[in-house]
Amino acid sequence: HFEVVAFAEEEGQRYKATFLGSGALIGDFKPEWLEQKDADGITMRQAMQHAGLNIDDIPKLQRQPADYLGFVEVHIEQGPVLNELDMPLGIVTSINGSIRMQCEIIGTASHAGTTPMDRRADAATALAELALYVEQRALTDGDSVATIGMLQVPNGSVNVVPGRCLFSLDMRAPVNAQRDALAADILAALQRICEKRGLRYTAEESMRAAAAPSAPAWQARWEAAVSSLGLPLHRMPSGAGHDAMK
């Protein structure tokens, strides 16, 4: 028989935990996640209870792999490729592995008018230099992608040289070795840029997800199904993470 499942919170936006629903399904929901707090100081436990969920039921969601023949996830592409090709379906060969980091560059806040350019410890210009490196490094690495999606200058002001920058790093590639090399090069660039400019930095890894190649037998079934509809086959990696990775 078929079991249809709608998962909760794959993205890990509100809390620093991803794949909550699918993690529970495979018995990988970590109890310590419940004590994490969001930006408003609300714990995950409180949010779930407010939504009417029974936390004690989470362990009951676990399924046994021996009871299942396979898992298939249908998802929109979330990208431009299929639209540009005018194709309705794509066959995913692998889900990219990813690493996420929360980082900070620390310089010295100083007056924008009275601090000469050659005496500044500007955290924002260091981050700008890093951002350009991130873009070029990923561009020259096949299907790799890298993004600085969050950027903040705490207590920033129009007339103050930025003393701190908080930012995120999201790095993805179809295979783990490629992903790891990308992350290592970007962190090395961060260190090099900060040393050159006399700045300090921190970098904390918040997520690491292994690349998930599609099972060959199931991929063959998908391809047969698409062909039976008279549609052309287009094989492609999935740059976005999905619950199927679990």
Where are these regions (language model features)?
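Midchain, well-structured core segments that form catalytic/ion-binding scaffolds
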Residues: E9-E10, R14-K16, L20-N176
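Metal-dependent amide/peptide-bond hydrolase catalytic core
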Residues: Q102, G113, A124-K246
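A structural signal for isolated positions on well-ordered beta-strands in alpha/beta enzyme cores
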Residues: E3-V5, T202
